[in-house]
Amino acid sequence: MTVRPSALDPAIASRLRRNDAGLFPAIAQQHDTGEVLMLGWMDDEALHRTLTTGRATYWSRSRGEYWVKGDTSGHQQWVRSVALDCDGDAVLVRVDQIGPACHTGTRNCFVADPLPTRVGDPGVTADAGPAR
């Protein structure tokens, strides 16, 4: 596993579960509406920068460098809160998104390619028909 040097609080770092590249997913969510905006990747240092600067910072897997959301596009993410999930293998970054979150220009990264989905019904089970 690749773990780059970081100033992240060791108490936080010890709770993180990372992949073999030393990364974990970071879900960006609009703080006031709950809209899921995007998924990025962080390592310990990206999380440290996010927690201490108030700007969402990610690790670019393709470029191999840190990037602060909005530094190039102007579509900034101002951090409102960060939460670690129950397994320690993902973080939820609640932000105030300025402009589109997606590099394609859409508000979020999940609008371009909806998949065909059978919609579930909590009152119906797959095998037995309607629940009683």
UniProtKB/Swiss-Prot annotation:
Listed InterPro entries: PRA-CH, PRib_AMP_CycHydrolase_dom, PRib_AMP_CycHydrolase_sf
Entry keyword Hydrolase: yes
Keywords, ordered alphabetically: Amino-acid biosynthesis, Cytoplasm, Histidine biosynthesis, Hydrolase, Magnesium, Metal-binding, Zinc
EC number of this enzyme: 3.5.4.19
Residue numbers binding Zn(2+): C86, C102, C109
Principal location: cytoplasm
GO cellular component, as recorded: cytoplasm
Top-level taxon in the UniProt lineage: Bacteria
Oligomer and partners: Homodimer.
Stated role: Catalyzes the hydrolysis of the adenine ring of phosphoribosyl-AMP.
Similarity annotation: Belongs to the PRA-CH family.
Designated name of the protein: Phosphoribosyl-AMP cyclohydrolase
Organism of derivation: Frankia alni (strain DSM 45986 / CECT 9034 / ACN14a)
